[in-house]
UniProtKB/Swiss-Prot annotation:
GO aspect biological process, one term: photosynthesis, light reaction
Keywords: Membrane, NAD, NADP, Plastoquinone, Quinone, Thylakoid, Translocase, Transmembrane, Transmembrane helix, Transport
Source species of the chain: Prochlorococcus marinus subsp. pastoris (strain CCMP1986 / NIES-2087 / MED4)
UniProt EC number: 7.1.1.-
Transmembrane segments: 10-30, 64-84, 89-109
Entry keyword annotation includes ATP-binding: no
Protein family membership: Belongs to the complex I subunit 3 family.
Protein name: NAD(P)H-quinone oxidoreductase subunit 3
HAMAP family: NDH1_NuoA
Quaternary structure and interacting proteins, as annotated: NDH-1 can be composed of about 15 different subunits; different subcomplexes with different compositions have been identified which probably have different functions.
Length: 120
C-alpha cells in the first residue's frame, strides 16, 4: 500500500466527520419514542392549530421577482471570479464579460418593458 505523509490528520478528520452524523442518527433511532399518537400526529404551525389547507396558490408576481433575483444572483456568481482575475485575463476576457453583461441588461430591459417588475 502506498504512503501519503502528512495526510493522517485529514484522514482522521474524515473519519470523525463521517462518524458524528452516523452516531447522531443511530442515537436518535435508539432513544426516540416509537409511537405517533395524539399531539405527535398534529401539524406544528407556530404553536397553533393549522388554518386552511397546505396547497395555497401564490401570486405569480412572487415567482417573477424570484426568477429575476436568481438570474442576477447567477450573474454575480459568474462575474466574481472574472473580477478577481481581471488583471491577468486581458482584453478578450473583458470583451466577453462586457457581452455577458450586455445580454443581461437587454433581458432586464425586456422584463421591465413587459411589466414583469411591476407589482400592480
Amino acid at each position: 500500500m502506498f504512503s501519503l505523509p502528512g495526510y493522517e490528520y485529514f484522514l482522521g478528520f474524515l473519519i470523525i466527520a463521517a462518524a458524528v452524523p452516523i452516531l447522531a442518527l443511530v442515537t436518535n433511532l435508539i432513544v426516540s419514542p416509537k409511537g405517533r399518537t395524539g399531539e405527535r400526529k398534529l401539524t406544528y404551525e407556530s404553536g397553533m392549530e393549522p388554518i386552511g389547507g397546505a396547497w395555497i396558490q401564490f401570486n405569480i408576481r412572487y415567482y417573477m421577482f424570484a426568477l429575476v433575483f436568481v438570474i442576477f444572483d447567477v450573474e454575480t456568481v459568474f462575474l466574481y471570479p472574472w473580477a478577481v482575475a481581471f488583471n491577468r485575463l486581458g482584453l478578450l476576457a473583458f470583451i466577453e464579460a462586457l457581452i455577458f453583461i450586455t445580454i443581461l441588461v437587454i433581458a432586464l430591459a425586456y422584463a421591465w418593458r413587459k411589466g414583469a417588475l411591476e407589482w400592480s
